[in-house]
Amino acid sequence: ALWKDILKNAGKAALNEINQIVQ
């Protein structure tokens, strides 16, 4: 379960950076 949380957090961070670049 821990690795799922890590992947989830990494995915959120990546999406946040992508959104910032787009905007």
Swiss-Prot record:
Keywords: Amidation, Amphibian defense peptide, Antibiotic, Antimicrobial, Cytolysis, Hemolysis, Secreted. The keyword Ribonucleoprotein does not apply. GO terms for biological process: defense response to bacterium; killing of cells of another organism. Expressed by the skin glands. Disulfide bonds: none annotated. Its main location: secreted. The modification Glutamine amide is found at residue 23. Belongs to the frog skin active peptide (FSAP) family. Dermaseptin subfamily. It comes from the Eukaryota. GO terms for cellular component: extracellular region. Antimicrobial peptide, active against the Gram-positive bacterium S.aureus, and the Gram-negative bacteria E.coli and P.aeruginosa. Has hemolytic activity (5% hemolysis at 128 ug/ml). This is Dermaseptin-4. It is found in: Secreted.
